[in-house]
Swiss-Prot record:
Originating species: Trichophyton tonsurans (Scalp ringworm fungus)
Keyword terms: Allergen
Protein name: 83 kDa hypersensitivity protein
Lineage of origin: Eukaryota, Fungi, Dikarya, Ascomycota, Pezizomycotina
Chain intervals with Basic and acidic residues compositional bias: 11-26
Top-rank lineage group of the source organism: Eukaryota
Region (Disordered) residue spans: 1-26
């Protein structure tokens, strides 16, 4: 994922992998 993916990702509590391979819950 790129920083743009995080910015444009829907923030509905979905967990998406961050660049470190961990999960970031928004």
């Amino acid at each position: 994922f790129t920083p743009e993916d995080f910015i444009s990702a829907p923030r509905r509590g979905e967990a998406i992998p961050d660049p470190k391979g961990e999960l970031a819950v928004f």
